[in-house]
């Protein structure tokens, strides 16, 4: 990838815990482009935090190569930089976490200034920069408040301002919204997306919540047991997931599975009659604009009872789901199902009446 800011080749991390051998990261190949928002999704223990701590060498790899920008940082598992060069690298990589790690006795401004204490700027310039950062994250009216006077979302905004103090090229967000309520999470993600758009900041999102990457990520990697099992554009991941775990994550973010489970508990679905099919249709892109259900009724004489529908937009492309009961004669139903299969629509037969 020609414009990669992070590139990992055959990277592994191996720990020895007494007699126990742990492979935290296994043979990872990953390139993250400059200026993109890249999501890494996985359950606890998947290895995503171990992977991301390699980027600023808080963890050392056991094998593989790594490039950060134009700097070769690891070759054949050996770290090539140390001392001042390593400190300079880490200054270019900001991090925010689930826990805000603010200085309780310092104000909002003081917390941001703390990140600039080793800067070569004059005191006046540091103060000017800190105030600008506080304003950028929308907290200028809280600049003299202490952390105890702030909400969780406001504390995370301070943490973001502090992480940006040394003009990083990369911002790593490690479960930074997992302790926040949905409304505050949305606001923090909007702030990160705005920073990315305005400054070109590369953002790496580590999360166990697919909803987080769905909202702002350009691309996604799914991890399990230290390995990346699937990676693609966010749209492609949601429109056509390949792995069962990826599908599980997507279902948790869409509400489709919950809706289907409720439908299956309905008495009329439990008593589905012969020549009735409960089906789920998946639409993406231009297929969401097609009047498929009405054309099936018109052209094949089947009736369609829509039980659930959902459309959301991923990367400005619509993705939709319908759960429908189709009924008609056996011949007409077969023709209708065959027609669906010819379209750019995913068909899953959930239940067939008897």
Swiss-Prot record:
Membrane topology per the entry is:
Peripheral membrane protein
Q: Does the keyword ATP-binding apply?
A: yes
Q: According to its UniProt record, which reaction does this protein catalyse?
A: L-methionine(out) + ATP + H2O = L-methionine(in) + ADP + phosphate + H(+); D-methionine(out) + ATP + H2O = D-methionine(in) + ADP + phosphate + H(+)
Record-listed ATP binding positions: 42-49
Q: Name one GO cellular component term.
A: plasma membrane
Q: Name one Pfam family in it.
A: ABC_tran
The entry lists its GO molecular-function terms as: ABC-type D-methionine transporter activity; ATP binding; ATP hydrolysis activity
User: Ranges for the ABC transporter domain?
Assistant: 6-250
Q: Which Enzyme Commission numbers does its entry carry?
A: 7.4.2.11
Quaternary structure, from the entry? The complex is composed of two ATP-binding proteins (MetN), two transmembrane proteins (MetI) and a solute-binding protein (MetQ).
Q: Which family does it belong to?
A: Belongs to the ABC transporter superfamily. Methionine importer (TC 3.A.1.24) family.
What protein is this chain from? Methionine import ATP-binding protein MetN 2
């Amino acid at each position: 990838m020609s414009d990669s800011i992070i590139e990992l080749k055959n990277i592994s991390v191996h720990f020895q815990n007494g007699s126990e051998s742990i492979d935290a990261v296994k043979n990872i190949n990953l390139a993250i482009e400059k200026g993109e928002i890249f999501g890494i999704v996985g359950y606890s223990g998947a290895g995503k935090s171990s992977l991301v701590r390699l980027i600023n060498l808080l963890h050392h790899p056991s094998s593989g190569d790594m490039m950060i920008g134009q700097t070769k940082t690891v070759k054949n598992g050996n770290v090539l930089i140390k001392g001042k060069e390593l400190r300079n690298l880490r200054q270019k990589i900001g991090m925010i976490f689930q826990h805000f790690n603010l200085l309780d006795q310092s104000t909002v401004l003081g917390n941001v200034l703390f990140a600039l204490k080793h800067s070569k700027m004059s005191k006046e310039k540091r103060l000017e920069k800190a105030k600008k950062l506080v304003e950028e994250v929308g907290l200028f009216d809280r600049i003299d408040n202490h952390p105890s006077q702030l909400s969780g979302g406001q504390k995370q905004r301070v943490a973001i301002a502090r992480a940006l103090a040394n003009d990083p090229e990369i911002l790593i967000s490690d479960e930074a919204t997992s302790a926040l309520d949905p409304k505050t999470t949305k606001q923090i993600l909007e702030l990160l997306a705005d920073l990315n758009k305005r400054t070109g900041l590369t953002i790496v999102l580590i999360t166990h919540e697919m909803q987080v990457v769905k909202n702002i990520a350009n691309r996604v990697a799914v991890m399990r047991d230290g390995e990346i099992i699937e990676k693609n554009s966010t749209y492609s991941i949601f429109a056509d997931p390949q792995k069962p775990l990826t599908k599980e994550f997507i279902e948790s973010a869409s509400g489709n599975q919950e809706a289907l489970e409720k439908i299956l508990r309905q008495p009329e679905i439990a008593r589905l009659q012969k020549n009735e099919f409960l089906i789920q249709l998946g639409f993406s892109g231009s297929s969401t604009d097609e009047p498929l259900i009405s054309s099936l009724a018109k052209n094949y004489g089947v009736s369609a009872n829509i039980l659930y529908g959902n459309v959301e937009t991923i990367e400005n492309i619509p993705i939709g789901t319908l759960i429908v009961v189709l009924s008609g004669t056996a011949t007409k139903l077969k023709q209708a199902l065959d027609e669906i299969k010819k379209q750019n629509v995913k068909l899953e037969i959930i239940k067939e009446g008897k």
